[in-house]
């Protein structure tokens, strides 16, 4: 089955997964994909940047510039035997922002999470079909932001829609 049209975003796929989410993308999957068995994932925690208005992160706070650390906290909590919070990870990384792919990979390494960088949307979609989750960097052409913004793709629901954990 073919994945939906390729979004214009850098992606990172985190392995060993199975999730929950809160928002669902409006984009329908191709009909032949919808007839396949779907994996419903419901255990990725949801955190929000607005819950951390005073926790320093990079040159701002988690609320103003912490989508990457919030996304990492969601996935790390899901993958590890520990409920990581965004403020805990911000302190762990010394308040240094990890708002790019290389630093996010570093965060995964420091937390000893299995991850791999996906080269295109097809790799991400296949990972979701296999029950994995993904942290993706959306660009200004997406419905999530007018600049850049990290979100978590937490799976594919029973209706064939991608489950999105958005920190905003």
Task: Tell me what each language-model feature is.
Residues 71-168:
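Conserved active-site-adjacent core of cysteine acyl-enzyme catalytic domains
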Residues 1-95:
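Active-site-adjacent structural segments surrounding the nucleophilic cysteine of cysteine proteases
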């Amino acid at each position: 089955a073919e994945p939906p049209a390729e979004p214009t975003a850098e992606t990172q796929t985190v392995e060993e997964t199975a999730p929950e989410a809160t928002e669902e993308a409006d984009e329908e999957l191709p009909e032949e994909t919808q007839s396949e068995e779907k994996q419903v994932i419901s255990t990725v925690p949801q955190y929000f940047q607005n819950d951390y208005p005073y926790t320093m992160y990079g040159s701002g706070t988690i609320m103003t510039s912490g989508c990457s650390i919030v996304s990492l906290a969601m996935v790390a909590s899901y993958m590890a035997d520990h409920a990581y919070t965004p403020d805990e990870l911000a302190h762990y990384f010394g308040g240094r922002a990890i708002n790019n792919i290389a630093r996010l990979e570093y965060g995964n390494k420091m937390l000893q999470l299995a991850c791999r960088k996906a080269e295109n949307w097809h790799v991400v979609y296949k990972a979701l079909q296999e029950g994995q989750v993904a942290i993706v960097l959306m660009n200004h052409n997406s419905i999530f932001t007018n600049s850049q913004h990290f979100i978590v793709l937490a799976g594919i629901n029973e209706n064939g829609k991608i489950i999105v954990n958005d920190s905003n």
